[in-house]
Amino acid sequence: MARHSVQIQTAVLATVLTIGGSVVGLAQSSQTKGDTYTWNGELVSLDTTAKTITVKSRVAYQEAISELKHFKAGDRVWIVWSGMHDFSDAVRQIRRAETGGKIDENLVLPAELVSTEAPNQSLTIRVTVPENALAAIKTVKPGEWVTVTSRHRPSTQDDAVVAVRPYAATTTTE
């Protein structure tokens, strides 16, 4: 009888560990997805040597457009995106990068300001991208759109962008 009880306890423990391990695995994979967000922009240029892309994005708010005059090409900036936790389609605010500062908000991207176009409600930024992102967009031509996946609260500018891919509307298969 005691042997049977030990076998049942062992089976229950194995089941709990299996289910618990699966739940932890799911939590980790969803946490990874939750650590990033996507945004879209028009590809201006790609520099494979410097591992950077230059992208034009829309500025959503009049206050942000008014602030553009305080920045110049080459400034290190923090782009604050408008949107939900995992997606943005426009810039909400532009800030001067804090030297040695740590980004402690979601939807904030460190970048180099390339140009501003207040009348067109857009700005152009340059960001560092990982090697695999360069390969993923090598066929994208300037003027075409890309989807960029960025990390929430990146520790450095070099790890802010996780991936880049050609922008594509959702398609259905029949």
Kindly give the residue locations of the regions a language model identified.
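Short, flexible, surface-exposed loop segments at domain boundaries
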Residues: A2-E174
